[in-house]
Amino acid sequence: MNGDSRAAVVTSPPPTTAPHKERYFDRVDENNPEYLRERNMAPDLRQDFNMMEQKKRVSMILQSPAFCEELESMIQEQFKKGKNPTGLLALQQIADFMTTNVPNVYPAAPQGGMAALNMSLGMVTPVNDLRGSDSIAYDKGEKLLRCKLAAFYRLADLFGWSQLIYNHITTRVNSEQEHFLIVPFGLLYSEVTASSLVKINLQGDIVDRGSTNLGVNQAGFTLHSAIYAARPDVKCVVHIHTPAGAAVSAMKCGLLPISPEALSLGEVAYHDYHGILVDEEEKVLIQKNLGPKSKVLILRNHGLVSVGESVEEAFYYIHNLVVACEIQARTLASAGGPDNLVLLNPEKYKAKSRSPGSPVGEGTGSPPKWQIGEQEFEALMRMLDNLGYRTGYPYRYPALREKSKKYSDVEVPASVTGYSFTSDGDSGTCSPLRHSFQKQQREKTRWLNSGRGDEASEEGQNGSSPKSKTKWTKEDGHRTSTSAVPNLFVPLNTNPKEVQEMRNKIREQNLQDIKTAGPQSQVLCGVVMDRSLVQGELVTASKAIIEKEYQPHVIVSTTGPNPFTTLTDRELEEYRREVERKQKGSEENLDEAREQKEKSPPDQPAVPYPPPSTPIKLEEDLVPEPTTGDDSDAATFKPTLPDLSPDEPSEALGFPMLEKEEEAHRPPSPTEAPTEASPEPAPDPAPVAEEAAPSAAEEGAAADPGSDGSPGKSPSKKKKKFRTPSFLKKSKKKSES
């Protein structure tokens, strides 16, 4: 090694910078007004502009002068050449192709066909091409049959059942005239439309050629005519040649019951087919082999035939027959022979199979009762319509449920009403009559604008009336002003099961009527409480307001309650003494009045006083019987007034009232004299004695108004007399009456 060698310094080239990658914002000027306008644009508006850019090419074609000139020339050519020029038909086809919406994904056909090629190109010929004057020549039933049969041909092409221009599917149009629809000979299944079908009779003669110039394969229709002649119930006949069907028709064992599709066909008929039918003996033999009930006929070494009472039923049987043949052909190829197969018992399957009139599947609501094959055929028609075929099929039951509005249209208030309340020229004041009229208008407008939570449904025709009637039914989701909060009064953090148990318990109590006042107090449960009222002392004006369980015997009285029932024995005794003391003073006044009356001259009339309106009870009815006992015995007293009568029965009580004393100073009015002279009705003896006492007392009070015998004293300085209780006072008006 070299001794003067030293550590070398390794120098690396400077790192190369990565090339600048152009970004989106490098190409955009943020200060550009166009960029700012597009950035601030709403997403929906930006999407609309993008759609307009995509449709710009179509708009350019429609707005081009060349297109307008060509269209005008074709219209002028139509006026010159007639109804259906070739250019107009071509333009109509172009319009059909452009307006048809073809999805990006198509269902894969089992065997393929010409329709698959057409769909891949994005061009589909519509099935229902009956437009304008073409549809006038056919009635509604024939139009529907033409659309169904043409759609059936399209399905056969999609499933791969077609064999170039051969094989036929026919349907009966009219049973009386024996007219049938068949495809023109030379037209592919993918080209068949409703207007291109040919109408023929039972002998094969053309009745209506349709929209084509092609004829009919009468030799091919011979098989169909033989079946139609033998089976009046048959409305549709299908004759196809499939590889699997031809393979099964060549087997000696025939169609084996190894699949549900094979068992769903029922009794299968066989016929040794020897080519095109040329003689009548062959027709009779076919009719004999088919029988009156068979729906499926296998032509030996030739093909398959299915019949049905409708187009849908014929499609159902031919579809199951083709599937059963494919299953059998593949099974025998893998099993090695019929002896290695497990056969099903047709008798057991027949008991479980659905009848022709039973509905297939039940959905929500009330779906129609499907016939055999109708539900499957309708589903395939929806598929064709989604692909853009425009089948014109009348759907019996829509697959998609229409979302019913939560609130009916009539619930939306009217934006404009035809009622005006005040005009511009009116003043603020109005008459009461006009105000009332405007109030009626406001009520009517409010009723018109207020929605109703009902839904209208049209009822069909019935036997009684041919008109349809509108029936209003209550809507389920009717709007309410306030929403009910569930479990509003349930405390938080509670067990839901306990709440439900308590709710059920309350409901049972309500049903069994065992409501109580609540839990019984544990403190007062042993205390025995005596009733303050005993039996027979409850006074009321009606027995209906008294519970019979507690008061079975009630005293009915129209007078008021006794005010002395609440007083004790001591208070009653004091009151009795006070009454006796006041009574002695009244007796002295009565004696003075008698003396004054004797001294008065005989020609001076006595001042008359009307008797009281109501009699006073006798002594024995007024004096309570004093009893000795505790305070509870006070409740046993009879509800009567205290004793206010003197000891002698001849002497009556009289209570001088202040009103009577003031009236005594007045001179007798002339109106009072006839009152005294008027005869009074003869009352009972007891009230007469009672009425004499107050009159005598009043006469004494009139003779000597002063209590101390001085007639010169003023009434204000009189000695204070005992005043009767308020319940015994009689008004001045009653006393004068």
UniProtKB/Swiss-Prot annotation:
Compartments reported by the entry: Cytoplasm, Cytoskeleton; Cell membrane
Biased composition (Basic residues): 715-737
GO MF annotations in UniProt: actin filament binding; calmodulin binding
Chain residue ranges for the region called Disordered: 1-21, 419-490, 576-737
Comp. bias (Pro residues): 602-614
GO cellular component: adherens junction; cytoplasm; cytoskeleton; focal adhesion; plasma membrane; postsynaptic density
Subunit structure of this chain's protein: Heterodimer of an alpha and a beta subunit or an alpha and a gamma subunit.
UniProt record similarity statement: Belongs to the aldolase class II family. Adducin subfamily.
Protein name: Alpha-adducin
